[in-house]
Amino acid sequence: MKLQGSLACLLLALCLGGGAANPLHSGGEGTGASAAHGAGDAISHGIGEAVGQGAKEAASSGIQNALGQGHGEEGGSTLMGSRGDVFEHRLGEAARSLGNAGNEIGRQAEDIIRQGVDAVHNAGSWGTSGGHGAYGSQGGAGVQGNPGPQGTPWASGGNYGTNSLGGSVGQGGNGGPLDYETNAQGAVAQPGYGTVRGNNQNSGCTNPPPSGSHESFSNSGGSSNDGSRGSQGSHGSNGQGSSGRGGGQGNSDNNGSSSSSSGSNSGNSNSGNSGNSNSGNSGNSGSGSRDIETSNFDEGYSVSRGTGSRGGSGGSGGSGGSGGSGGSGGGNKPECNNPGNDVRMAGGSGSQGHGSNGGNIQKEAVNGLNTMNSDASTLPFNIDNFWENLKSKTRFINWDAINKGHAPSPSTRALLYFRKLWENFKRSTPFFNWKQIEGSDLSSLQKRAGGADQFSKPEARQDLSADSSKNYYNNQQVNPTYNWQYYTKTTAKAGVTPSSSSASRAQPGLLKWLKFW
């Protein structure tokens, strides 16, 4: 009974510990800690007392019963006084050790419950979400550059007009406004490359600059006229001097800077100086430029294919300068697959100026057209080739006879054609006795078969008629033999043209067959 009571106390202590741990979700950290401490003390004291008292009482009662039954009432009372105290002392020590073990178990349970309280408390509180990062400020548009001073042309022949170089391109800062600079000629420099595009999810995508030159070199020849004003570039760029579209033909301006637009770099190549002539000034070289088109892809980063301007025609004895080649569009990284990147194409190369001794470029164009028109092989249709192909595909026609004029008359050709059809019909119907149907006489057979010696005797004629009548009426043979007639043909190449009367005489059986039907 004592042992059962101890177990009941242990279960009650555990239940109280579970009930004390229940308010942890609502009471906070202090309530959970106190409940855990109380549950640990209850478990330790309950286990120690229950185990110690139960073991002590069970051992005492067991020893007393054993000694009483084994030695009788007298000996039992004597031994009970001496040995009972010894066993009771030892069992008390064992009970104390078990109580210490129960206290240790209680402390471990208290630590476990306290850890659970801390975990529940930490999970119940949620931290506030971090704020969104501030967006970078939009870079301001550049100020339009003022046109620079006009270059002074030199009057003396053979000297080259100098032209100051354009300023270097400013490097745009990351996230900052785009830097614009004006060069000495007034052309607005392009925005710096290397900046991150706006609205681009690939933060590491930067645009390398195009392969064209950032600076404009345009050294014009002597005694050059002022070129026409360049076309107005987009976003405040103003080209001074001759550009790809507005430059005067033959003469390049001293202020040879190209037009540019915001968000794209027009690559201008160095236009070479033309050669010296024996007399007079050398031709002027056209400055390379590109036609810039803006689009709505990614902040204006679309570069279309540019074409270089044609070099000017040479003066007397001077050769024309070469046109500048348009710069190619900037490269794209493979990971930056944006829709705007597909339009960035390579720039076209400028055309070479062909100068002659006082000549004109239009003469070469006219000569080229005349050469193309005079060449018959380049024509899309050639009647000779067509006629040869037609004759090769229609070999059943005697083209040689047609070309030589030896073709037979239409009536003769019709009779020959029908004769061929008639012979084919008789060969396809061997079950008819065509000799009796046609009723051909011996003279016609001799003429057609060429065997006059075979049918010269009357007996042979009678035997032939008797045999043929017998074969016609009795028809005893399975495969009757026929005397097929083969007519002598006169070829058209031999030059013999049979008349209609001769053709009708060669076909007496055909006329009789028509009368029979």
Curated annotation (Swiss-Prot):
<protein>
    <recommendedName>
        <fullName>Dermokine</fullName>
    </recommendedName>
</protein>
<keyword id="KW-0221">Differentiation</keyword>
<feature type="compositionally biased region" description="Polar residues">
    <location>
        <begin position="197"/>
        <end position="206"/>
    </location>
</feature>
<feature type="compositionally biased region" description="Gly residues">
    <location>
        <begin position="308"/>
        <end position="332"/>
    </location>
</feature>
<feature type="signal peptide">
    <location>
        <begin position="1"/>
        <end position="21"/>
    </location>
</feature>
<feature type="region of interest" description="Disordered">
    <location>
        <begin position="51"/>
        <end position="83"/>
    </location>
</feature>
<feature type="region of interest" description="Disordered">
    <location>
        <begin position="123"/>
        <end position="364"/>
    </location>
</feature>
<feature type="compositionally biased region" description="Gly residues">
    <location>
        <begin position="236"/>
        <end position="250"/>
    </location>
</feature>
<keyword id="KW-0325">Glycoprotein</keyword>
<comment type="function">
    <text>May act as a soluble regulator of keratinocyte differentiation.</text>
</comment>
<feature type="compositionally biased region" description="Gly residues">
    <location>
        <begin position="167"/>
        <end position="176"/>
    </location>
</feature>
<feature type="compositionally biased region" description="Gly residues">
    <location>
        <begin position="347"/>
        <end position="358"/>
    </location>
</feature>
<feature type="compositionally biased region" description="Low complexity">
    <location>
        <begin position="251"/>
        <end position="289"/>
    </location>
</feature>
<feature type="compositionally biased region" description="Low complexity">
    <location>
        <begin position="212"/>
        <end position="235"/>
    </location>
</feature>
<dbReference type="GO" id="GO:1903575">
    <property type="term" value="P:cornified envelope assembly"/>
</dbReference>
<dbReference type="GO" id="GO:0030154">
    <property type="term" value="P:cell differentiation"/>
</dbReference>
<feature type="compositionally biased region" description="Gly residues">
    <location>
        <begin position="127"/>
        <end position="145"/>
    </location>
</feature>
<dbReference type="GO" id="GO:0005615">
    <property type="term" value="C:extracellular space"/>
</dbReference>
<keyword id="KW-0964">Secreted</keyword>
<keyword id="KW-0732">Signal</keyword>
<dbReference type="InterPro" id="IPR033541">
    <property type="entry name" value="Dermokine"/>
</dbReference>
<comment type="similarity">
    <text>Belongs to the dermokine family.</text>
</comment>
<comment type="subunit">
    <text>Homooligomer. Seems to be able to homodimerize and homotrimerize.</text>
</comment>
